[in-house]
A protein has these predicted regions:
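Structured aminoacyl-transfer and RNA-binding surfaces used for tRNA recognition/handling
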Residues: 5-228
Length: 228
């Protein structure tokens, strides 16, 4: 059997034909760690976030495991010390973060972030998606009067600023790398995308507009479009 037959096509990494890594394998690992550290500091400062520890697994009856689209199966196991009661590896911290904001007595304008580790057994695998998730996850309390488009855009700009700050430090540490992010991020709604590119699929619209603008935030995702 060849590699594709042994592990299946979904497990293979796909590289552009002209791809060539600018860093050695070792420097790539150093850069990954540096990016994670620098972005953590910048994100916390920009959004006024406090780091908290998150669970790796929870009991099903707590209702704190995020169920994503509602069809993904969590990884489950029993714990001897709990009388063989069942636990689930977290798939999402969406519910837990809201619980934690209340538990730790956060106030409007404040928030938390955590180093989320999760296992998603039903994830569709490709270059960007893995069954193992390791990501910075955050949540903030927004006063009801501030829950509007301008607040959303403000948060996006702050996150993008943190990304730019991280990129700047990365290039200083590894001069062989080049600037990738534009100075500003642009905004567009999903309906505006459909109006601009009616002949394309939703994914194609995103790709075309991202290539055109360089850095985009798509808003109002999930609501019905005029096309139905």
């Amino acid at each position: 059997l060849n590699a594709a037959e042994r592990i299946g096509p979904a497990m293979l990494s796909i590289y552009p034909k002209q791809y060539r890594s600018l860093l050695s394998v070792r420097d790539t690992q150093v850069a990954i760690k540096a990016i994670k550290d620098w972005f953590e500091v910048s994100l916390a400062q920009e959004l006024n976030l406090t780091r908290v520890s998150a669970p790796l697994f929870v009991r099903p009856e707590t209702g704190l495991n995020g169920n994503l689209n509602g069809v993904e199966r969590p990884v489950t196991f029993t714990v001897k010390g709990l009388g063989e009661r069942q636990c689930e590896v977290v798939q999402s911290l969406a519910k837990w973060k809201r619980f934690a904001l209340k538990k730790y007595s956060f106030h409007p304008g404040e928030g938390l972030y955590t180093d989320m580790n999760a296992v998603r057994r039903d994830e569709e695998l490709d270059n960007l998606h893995s069954i193992y998730v390791d990501q910075w996850d955050w949540e903030a309390i927004i006063d009801r009067k501030d829950r509007n488009l301008w607040t959303l855009m403000g948060y996006v700009r702050k996150i993008y600023k943190a990304l730019k700050q991280t990129e700047r430090r990365l290039i200083q540490a590894f001069p062989v790398l080049e600037t990738y992010l534009l100075d500003r991020i642009s905004f567009i709604t999903s309906q505006e995308l459909e109006d601009a590119y009616p002949e394309l699929t939703p994914r194609e619209r995103e790709n075309v507009h991202a290539r055109k603008k360089g850095a985009i935030c798509i808003m109002q995702i999930g609501g019905p479009l005029r096309s139905g």
